[in-house]
Each structure stands twice: as structure tokens, then as C-alpha cells.
Regions:
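Conserved proline-anchored active-site loop of SAM-dependent methyltransferases
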Residues: 6-44, 50-51, 79-80, 86-106, ...
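Conserved SAM/SAH-binding beta-strand->alpha-helix loop
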Residues: 54
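Conserved SAM-binding loop
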Residues: 61-62
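Conserved SAM-binding strand-loop segment of SAM-dependent methyltransferases
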Residues: 67-79
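Mobile active-site "lid"/loop adjacent to the S-adenosyl-L-methionine
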Residues: 88-134, 153-156, 160
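Short, conserved SAM-binding segment of the class I
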Residues: 127-134, 138, 165, 169
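Conserved beta-strand signature within the Rossmann-like core of class I S-adenosyl-L-methionine
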Residues: 142-150
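Class I S-adenosyl-L-methionine
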Residues: 153-201
């Protein structure tokens, strides 16, 4: 798939099981992207709504998820201004890492407001966090906001420190950093599985 990142559906299921309240039923994803989390949530009967800036991604995901037990819906919108219509019991998102991937619509171009087309990291961060602000407003009390994120590097090879800024952002808004999960994909730890590959001369 051209090295595009794909969210692991098993990780989606684990996150739902760990962080959805016992009687929770609604999930909001402010940066929708691919179908995986919505499909898993809908399969288990949860209500899932996502803000997604690309019409082609919305159409593809909505077609895949139209017959699930729970409604899963991607809405063409800008996350920095979109407000969910109902309170939610879990916010999950896996937003873009700055300047790592390209997100295009039907016309082969990034839609206006697409995060990775924003010229500076600071503008990217502020737009990303504006989307988080809207999601926090929709989140019920004593519920989790789960972000799967990573860092990227500037032209000098230095980290932007986006992960650290995430933690400060949420703490400044009264949320608590409850847990950190390091996610290792099997593809990148394959060498450790095959004993002979570790025998060097």
C-alpha cells in the first residue's frame, strides 16, 4: 500500500475493551482516516461517529460499514470546527504525523484544511489541538481520550516533540495522563522472532 500506515484492528479492539466504560455506547474520532476503528466499534454494537476531511475516505468507509450492528458514520468536516451532536463515552483518534503521509481527495489534491498540507508545524499543531478541544467538549465526565500518535523530524533531523506537546496540552485542559502504551508492530520486530537471524559472525 505504498508504505501508508494502516491502523491495526486488533489494537482497535483492545482499546475499546480497555477504555470504553461498562455502560458506554458512543465513540467519537476527530481525525477519522481509515475504516478500522469504526468497523470494530460498529461490529461490537457501539455508535461511532468520525470527522474526516476527505470525501473519498468518508464515502469508502460509510459503504463498508453500512450493515454493521452499530451505526458507524464518517462525516465530511473539518475537525477543528466540527461539534458532535451528542455526548460521547470514548474519544479515540490516530491523527496524522506532521509531513509523514499525503492525504488526497477525489481530485488528487489535499482538501483545504488537511493537516499535512499546512505549511508550518506550529500551525499543524494548533489546528490539531483545536480538533481535540471540540472532542474534549463532547466527552462525558470520567471517560477516556485515547490518542495514538508519534513524532516526526524537521529539516535538521530534530524531533518536533509533538508527543510531549500532546501531554502538556491535555494536562493544561484539566485532563490526566492516565497511561502510556508503546505499540510495537510485528513487522518491525520480525528479526527478534527468528533466532538464526541474530547469530552473527
Amino acid at each position: 500500500n505504498g508504505n501508508a500506515s494502516v491502523l491495526d484492528p486488533v489494537a482497535c479492539e483492545v482499546i475499546l475493551r480497555f477504555f470504553m466504560p461498562t455502560h458506554g455506547k458512543r465513540v467519537y474520532n476527530p481525525f477519522g482516516g481509515g475504516v478500522q476503528f469504526g468497523f470494530v466499534a460498529g461490529h461490537y454494537g457501539f455508535e461511532y461517529v468520525s470527522s474526516e476531511i476527505r470525501q473519498n475516505q468518508c464515502d469508502a468507509n460509510n459503504a463498508i460499514c453500512q450493515d454493521l450492528p452499530g451505526p458507524a458514520k464518517w462525516i465530511k468536516s473539518d475537525s477543528s470546527t466540527y461539534e458532535p451532536l451528542q455526548k460521547v463515552d470514548l474519544v479515540f483518534t490516530c491523527p496524522p504525523y506532521y509531513k509523514v503521509e499525503e492525504y488526497l481527495d477525489y481530485d488528487g489534491k489535499p482538501p483545504a484544511g488537511e493537516l499535512n498540507s499546512i505549511p508550518t508545524y506550529e500551525e499543524f499543531r494548533d489546528t490539531l489541538f483545536a480538533g481535540y478541544e471540540k472532542a474534549i467538549e463532547a466527552l462525558n465526565d470520567n471517560c477516556f481520550f485515547v490518542v495514538m500518535t508519534g513524532d516526526s523530524r524537521d529539516k535538521n533531523g530534530a524531533y518536533y516533540c509533538c508527543e510531549a506537546e500532546h501531554e502538556l496540552f491535555f494536562k493544561e485542559r484539566g485532563l490526566h495522563v492516565y497511561n502510556k502504551i508503546v505499540y510495537l508492530e510485528c513487522e518491525f520486530t520480525r528479526l527478534a522472532h527468528a533466532k538464526k537471524t541474530l547469530n552473527y559472525r
